[in-house]
A protein has these predicted regions:
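Short S/T/G/P-rich N-terminal loop/turn motif that feeds into the first structured element of a domain
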Residues: 1-105, 114-134
Length: 134
């Protein structure tokens, strides 16, 4: 079991609970954690999401966030974690393809200021329990 304390990103300060319908019963979540080699690199990656506009690109391509957070206490520091929601794996794959092809992402990814900000990525696909509130 892992425990952590996280703080929300400035650009998304609250949990976005997905609207649920009967068709959403098969929805899935993607929980991604980006580890950095040091606090300066981690701060730049958080800036990339906030001021750099990466969250806006997510929204533009259909990567629907539930939350974005920076870990204050926990394992593998420094790191940030975010969660996305999808109807199914096909929707997830299509949204990530749109993200990688987005011209704003291509420009942001080439910005030297944001180079070498992530040293490891953990990516977990989750299915919510029937009683899940998100």
């Amino acid at each position: 079991m892992e425990s952590s304390l996280k703080v929300a990103f400035d650009e998304m300060p609250e949990l976005a609970v997905p609207a649920l319908t009967e068709e959403d019963a098969s929805r899935l979540f993607e929980l991604r954690t980006y580890e950095s080699h040091g606090p300066t690199a981690a701060r730049r990656k958080v800036e990339m999401f906030n001021e750099g506009g990466e969250i806006d690109i997510f929204l533009d391509v259909g990567l629907t966030p539930v939350f974005f957070s920076e870990t204050l206490i926990g394992d593998n520091l420094p790191n940030l974690t975010y969660m996305l929601v999808f109807e199914n794996l096909q929707e997830r794959d299509a949204a990530w393809d749109r993200f990688l092809d987005h011209p704003d992402w291509k420009e942001l990814a080439q910005n030297e200021y944001y180079n070498n900000t992530v040293s490891n990525i953990r990516d977990i696909i989750l299915q919510p329990a029937p009683y899940s509130q998100i």
